[in-house]
Design a protein with these regions (language model features):
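N-terminal extension/subdomain marker
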Residues: 146-289, 298-301
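Short, well-ordered loop/turn elements at secondary-structure boundaries
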Residues: 98-99, 107, 287-289, 317
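Short acidic-glycine loop/turn motifs at beta-strand connectors
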Residues: 106-108, 296-297, 306-308
Length: 326
């Protein structure tokens, strides 16, 4: 069982607090001197009290930034203040629990995130212990998410760790790969924040592409009537699909993760003004005026099932195109 997980729409007030780099506190007048020695700054004062602020600690700021990213990306359910709590024995309500810094659920994916930071760049001698502990929750977390928030299909469980100023060794990276835990650092986080600011919830599927390379997502399978043709040495398919599904299985371009120039590439390819004009055109005319070219990565993501047709086998062939995100 998962505790402290809510519908995202119920967390608007929390989202405002987490989106800020500072924390705020209202205090009585006699408390002000002590608070000032603890690093609080006086914002405004009245006859009976005052409002103070101070920068968030780095560990708090990292968790809040990661949580805010998932909120901006449109996850349906998110952990509340203090993270989520996973019961290690679902049959015992008062049994031991595992705290998870950030949890996000959407129709395809359930993600459990731990956040690790340091005040200055350094190695963490216990990082592999953290990896092992996080890896142990995978099955319980997946079962709890799918049982408490059921769907016609099971979500894919993703375990990730966001780090800030932690220096990871080759052994750390290898152990994370063995545990199938995604490692992302402060540069990756900044990249996704910029991408989310530019694309909004659509950036979620770029995150999925990076967290789940080659992973089959059961909620993202569909079949379409299609025509198969040849263009030089390449096999091509012509088909129609809903924009919502295309968005989930496609991303705009390959990139080297975490580089600012990749966001610049997105901004050139998908300008907000251009997107607005396209949206207005579709809204007014009900059609998209041109084809979209999609490149499939390998044979595992596409399967063409030929149908009977009259005439010879030369030229175009009619059939069913089976697509899946993987």
């Amino acid at each position: 069982m998962l505790e402290n997980v809510f519908v995202a729409d119920e967390l608007k007030s929390l989202a405002r607090r987490k989106s800020r780099d500072e924390e705020f506190h209202t205090a009585r007048k006699q408390e002000i001197p002590n608070l000032l020695t603890e690093g609080w700054n006086l914002q405004r004062e009245n006859k009976t009290g005052a409002r103070l602020s101070r920068p968030k600690r780095r560990d708090v700021l990292l968790e809040d930034r990661v949580w805010s990213l998932l909120y901006t990306l449109g996850f349906n359910h998110l952990s509340g203040e203090g993270g989520a709590f996973l019961h290690l024995d679902p049959k015992k309500n008062n049994g031991p629990k595992n705290q998870i810094d950030v949890v996000g659920l959407d129709p395809e994916v359930a993600i459990a995130i731990e956040c690790k930071s340091a005040s200055a760049p350094r190695r963490d001698p216990k990082f592999q212990e953290s990896l092992a502990k996080h890896g142990l929750i995978r099955e319980r977390f997946a079962n709890a998410a799918n049982a408490q928030f059921p769907l016609p299909h099971k979500r894919v469980a993703v375990l990730a760790i966001f780090t800030w100023d932690l220096l990871l060794s080759e052994n750390d990276l290898q152990r994370a790969e063995e545990q199938k835990i995604a490692l992302l650092n402060e540069n990756d986080l900044a990249y996704y924040e910029q991408l989310a600011a530019h694309l909004g919830p659509a950036a979620k599927y770029q995150l999925f592409a990076d967290l789940l390379p080659g992973k089959q997502i059961h909620g993202l399978r569909l079949a379409f009537p299609a025509i198969e043709t040849k263009m030089g040495k390449h096999t091509c398919f012509s088909f129609s699909m809903t924009p919502e599904y295309l968005l989930k299985i496609a991303y705009v371009s390959h990139r080297a993760k975490g580089k600012a120039r990749d966001v610049d590439t997105y901004q050139r390819m998908i300008k907000k003004g251009r997107l607005k004009r396209i949206r207005e055109y579709i809204r007014e005319n009900g059609i998209f005026p041109t084809n979209i070219v999609v490149s499939f990565e390998g044979r595992r993501s596409v399967r063409f099932e030929k149908r009977e047709q009259q005439g010879g086998a030369e030229g175009a062939r009619y059939g069913t195109l089976h697509l899946r995100a993987c």
